[in-house]
A protein has these predicted regions:
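Short, compositionally biased, intrinsically disordered N-terminal export/targeting signals
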Residues: 1-13
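Long, well-structured alpha-helical subdomains associated
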Residues: 18-27, 32, 36, 139-192, ...
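Cytosolic juxtamembrane segments of membrane proteins
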Residues: 55-62, 72, 196-210
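Active-site recognition of the HExxH zinc-binding catalytic motif
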Residues: 112-131
Length: 260
C-alpha cells in the first residue's frame, strides 16, 4: 500500500494534510459552540445582581462596617472612592465588583451592589490572611493561562500510532481537556472560599439572616458562573482533542481493508 508504514507488526497509513485541516476546522467550530454556552451559566447571577440595585440600602451600611470588623482596614484595604470607578464601567454601573491585590482596593459601587462587597472582602481576606486562600489566589491566573494553552494543544496533529510509546507531550495532548478543567479549579475554589468568608463576615456585622440568605443565593449563582467556566473549558478542549485525534492520527490498516 502506497505511503503506508509498519509499527509493532501493524500496518498504518498517515493521514493527509486535508484530513488534518478538516479536523482543525471542525474542532474549532465545535469548541466555539461549546464555549458559546457560557452565558447560560452567568445569566442567573447577572440577573439577580441587577435586581439587588433596588435593595442596596439594606446592605450598604453593613458592608462599609465590615472592613473594620474584619480588621482589613489595618491591612490597608479600602473601598475605592466613586471617582475611582468612572473609567471602569462594569463597576461604576453596578454590573461587577472586584478586589485589586496591587492597591488593596475593593472596586465596587456601594450605591448599587453593596451585597457583592462582602464577597470582595472575602477575596481580600484570602489575599492577606491565611495560607490556603493566598495560595489559591496566586494560582488563579497561571491556571487560567494553562487552560488557554490547552486549547491550542488540543489542535495539534497526532502523528504517532495509538499503540506507540507515549512521551510527556503525548500525555498532554491525550489529556489536555482534563488538564484544562483542573487548571480552572483554583479559581473556582478561591471564589467559593471568598464567598464563604464574606457570609461569615456579614454575620459579624449583625446583618439580618433573611438578608444573608438572599446573599448566599446570589453567591451560589456567582460560583455557578466559575464552575460552569471550568466545565465548559474542559469539554471544549477535550472535544477539540478528540476530533483532532480522529482526523490526524495514523490509521491502522485491517486485513479486510487491504485489496490485492
Amino acid at each position: 500500500m502506497v505511503n503506508s508504514f509498519y509499527y509493532d507488526g501493524n500496518q498504518y497509513i498517515p493521514r493527509t494534510q486535508s484530513d488534518s485541516s478538516k479536523g482543525f476546522i471542525l474542532a474549532s467550530l465545535v469548541s466555539s459552540a461549546i464555549m458559546g454556552t457560557l452565558p447560560a451559566f452567568s445569566k442567573p447571577f447577572s440577573t439577580q445582581l441587577v435586581k439587588e440595585h433596588y435593595d442596596n440600602y439594606l446592605y450598604k451600611d453593613a458592608f462599609e462596617k465590615s472592613i473594620k470588623v474584619s480588621g482589613l482596614d489595618k491591612k490597608g484595604v479600602q473601598i475605592a472612592p466613586a471617582q475611582f470607578l468612572k473609567d471602569r464601567s462594569p463597576e461604576f454601573f453596578g454590573q461587577n465588583a472586584c478586589y485589586n491585590t496591587e492597591n488593596k482596593k475593593i472596586l465596587i459601587n456601594t450605591d448599587k451592589i453593596s451585597i457583592a462587597g462582602f464577597h470582595e472582602a472575602g477575596h481580600a481576606l484570602n489575599d492577606l490572611k491565611g495560607i490556603s486562600g493566598k495560595l489559591l489566589s496566586k494560582m488563579r491566573w497561571p491556571g487560567r493561562a494553562v487552560a488557554g494553552l490547552m486549547g491550542y494543544v488540543a489542535l495539534f496533529q497526532r502523528t504517532k500510532p495509538k499503540e506507540a510509546p507515549r512521551d510527556k507531550m503525548d500525555f498532554i495532548k491525550d489529556n489536555c481537556g482534563k488538564i484544562a478543567f483542573v487548571s480552572m479549579l483554583p479559581t473556582v475554589l478561591e471564589e467559593g472560599m471568598a464567598s464563604y468568608k464574606g457570609v461569615k463576615l456579614a454575620r459579624k456585622t449583625g446583618l439580618a439572616e433573611p438578608l444573608i440568605k438572599n446573599m448566599k443565593k446570589l453567591y451560589a449563582k456567582a460560583l455557578l458562573t466559575y464552575a460552569g467556566h471550568a466545565v465548559v473549558a474542559g469539554l471544549a478542549v477535550g472535544a477539540s482533542s478528540m476530533i483532532m485525534d480522529y482526523f490526524s492520527r495514523p490509521k491502522k490498516i485491517k486485513d479486510e481493508d487491504i485489496f490485492y
